[in-house]
């Protein structure tokens, strides 16, 4: 096979629809817009959510709840993500950020107990689930709860 013999995969290069170019093209005359009416006009059509004048669904349903602007934004990670550290490492939120285990530390980091921990680590400055504390201590590590 040579460079000039290369061809794209069958069906991967689909020609665009050329509408309104005569009846022989299959998309002439009304160009796929049907007969008259709002949708046949240029710029025609209705906005998203419009139901023909009937009260639309997004206005029929009541508003509900609010966003608490004082909510603590805590980043959570599972135990098995801590296996990247060497035995005896002191793991802090800053170290997790530096090693890109978390992308940002907002109002803190919480360690959850999913997975297994194979290293003996000292974890500081984080929140923990009960199962995470048990697994860290079972692996020979220490937990310093904030």
Curated annotation (Swiss-Prot):
The keyword Nucleotidyltransferase does not apply. GO terms for biological process: translation. InterPro entries: Ribosomal_uL15, Ribosomal_uL15/eL18, Ribosomal_uL15/eL18_sf, Ribosomal_uL15_bac-type, Ribosomal_uL15_CS. Residues 1-54 are annotated as: Disordered. It comes from the Bacteria. GO terms for molecular function: rRNA binding; structural constituent of ribosome. Residues 21-31, 42-52 have a biased composition (Gly residues). One of its GO terms (cellular component) is cytosolic large ribosomal subunit. Keywords: Ribonucleoprotein, Ribosomal protein, RNA-binding, rRNA-binding. HAMAP family: Ribosomal_uL15. Part of the 50S ribosomal subunit. Binds to the 23S rRNA. Belongs to the universal ribosomal protein uL15 family. NCBIfam families: rplO_bact. This is Large ribosomal subunit protein uL15. It comes from Clostridium beijerinckii (strain ATCC 51743 / NCIMB 8052). The lineage of its organism: Bacteria, Bacillati, Bacillota, Clostridia, Eubacteriales. The gene is rplO.
């Amino acid at each position: 096979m040579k460079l000039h013999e290369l061809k794209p995969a069958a069906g991967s290069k689909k020609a665009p629809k050329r509408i309104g170019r005569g009846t022989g093209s299959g998309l002439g005359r009304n160009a796929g817009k049907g007969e008259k009416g709002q949708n046949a006009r240029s710029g025609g059509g209705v906005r998203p959510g419009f139901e023909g004048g009937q009260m639309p669904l997004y206005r029929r349903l009541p508003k509900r709840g609010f966003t608490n602007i004082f909510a603590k934004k805590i980043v959570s990670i599972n135990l098995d993500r801590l296996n990247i550290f060497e035995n005896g490492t002191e793991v802090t939120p800053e170290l997790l950020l530096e090693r890109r285990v978390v992308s940002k530390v907002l109002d803190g980091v919480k360690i959850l107990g999913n997975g297994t921990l194979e290293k003996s680590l000292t974890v500081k400055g984080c929140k923990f689930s009960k199962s995470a504390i048990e697994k860290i201590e079972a692996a020979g590590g220490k937990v310093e709860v904030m």
